[in-house]
Amino acid sequence: MSRMNTIYAVIDLGSWYIRGMVARKMEDGRVSPISFYEEPANNCIRHGCVHNIDEAAAIIRRIVNQLNENLEDNTHITSLYVGVGGQSIASQEFIVRKAMVPEGEVIRTEHIESLWAEMRGASFPDKEVLDVTDPLFYVDGKQEIQAKGVFCHELEARFQLITARRSVKQNIRIAIEERLGLRLTGILVTPLCEAQVLLSDDELTLGCCYVNIGAGCTSVSIYKNRLLAMLRVLPMGGYNVTRDLTSLRLTEQEAENMKLNHVSMINDNKSNGSFRMTFADKFSEREFRSSEVNRLAKARMDEITANYLNILRLSGLLEDIGAGIILNGGGTKINNYMAAMKKILGEVTPAKIRMDRIDTDNAISFIEEHISTIGLAYKATQPCTDYITTNLGELVSQIETKEEIPANDTVQDLFAQGRQTERKENEQRDNTDRQREDTPKQTVKKKEKTGPSFGDKLKGAFIKFGSLFDEDTNQDNNR
């Protein structure tokens, strides 16, 4: 079965939203989304992990039903990939060594396979291995990118095993297989899947720290020489800011709106003033001092920032991330957060999806909320749908029923027409070489260091962390 005929179904368990997507893949592996649907998590997901199994199953059931509506007739989702990024997820380094014959020998495929086999026997108390990254090889104590074919006396492989509490997989399995009757095709580590569709080859080669500030969690993935060097997940995110703002006698939704529309991480002229908010009833209004609101939000964002920078500091990899910090997630959308971080650290850039990972002719690919599910679909390898055949009598009955229903120009009708057109175009493309304008790749080069290094800037950030984002924070506190 070709990739374009295979449909992948993925679910991303976010603390704020649970999101689902069905997608195909182009022949070159690029993801082509078919449809996307999301629902509020309603507190059934806490810090990225399933808390209320029944509520999570009910939400996923509704998402699956909506996704099925946009599939071809008689095609239904029968299995799911589920992405997780909860607080118990972390990388564990696992080192395997193999002594060669005393006189030394050339490393062969079977030597490398024996290291993988020994790694598969690794176990951790109360933890389950969700994923394993490609290893970093050391030949006679020296790092080697391509170990096969090298003469040595000792071969070492350093794996990064991604582990989580056993209950993480158990709760997902119960929700998907027992409650919904679907097959759990695989559990994918969301931060790693996101990195595959966001980080460029240059960023991976130079080394970088990919940070996603989500609603309930903040993931920190550090890459060195194209390989994962460390993964940690913090149990805090943008939702903590929202919850702090509820202390102003606001509902969570009102606090969320305030966070997105009125909070700023840099003091400016507006910070000295005030603003008015209209509440859900559309009638009542209240006035808020910008300095008070910003002070609450800044305190929590300071804490989140301090924690992920501390993970980077403790990793010992400060001088190995030539591409700096790559920021993503809803928490980074707070006004001026990105500008504040650039002011302090310099080497900070917003994450951008790679054009060679998505179908650039598909508008759904470019919606920011889809990044996680696109990453999951990119990682997926097994088909997730089945085609249910219909006998001739049922088919005639369905056609007659459809003819009796007047056509309406609804969104679903237009979507179906669009999918039919797309299928015809894909059939035509199969017979010809598809030409595509590739976006020129901007090579990331290490800049000549004329000032403080990234590590020096980070140390400076810790020294002045009492007023991380600007020099006026202390003035705010005295008002």
UniProtKB/Swiss-Prot annotation:
Positions with biased composition (Basic and acidic residues): 420-440
Gene3D superfamilies membership: 3.30.420.40
InterPro entries in the record: ATPase_NBD, Cell_div_FtsA, FtsA/MreB, SHS2_FtsA
Segments of this protein annotated with the region Disordered: 417-458
One GO cellular component term noted in the UniProt record for this chain: cell division site
Any Gene Ontology biological process: FtsZ-dependent cytokinesis
SUPFAM superfamilies: Actin-like ATPase domain
Subcellular location as annotated: Cell inner membrane
Membrane-topology descriptor: Peripheral membrane protein
Signal peptide: none
Top-level taxon of the source organism: Bacteria
Keywords annotated in UniProt: Cell cycle, Cell division, Cell inner membrane, Cell membrane, Membrane
Cysteine pairings via disulfide bonds: none
Family: Belongs to the FtsA/MreB family.
Function: Cell division protein that is involved in the assembly of the Z ring. May serve as a membrane anchor for the Z ring.
Subunit structure: Self-interacts. Interacts with FtsZ.
HAMAP family: FtsA
Protein name: Cell division protein FtsA
Source organism: Porphyromonas gingivalis (strain ATCC BAA-308 / W83)
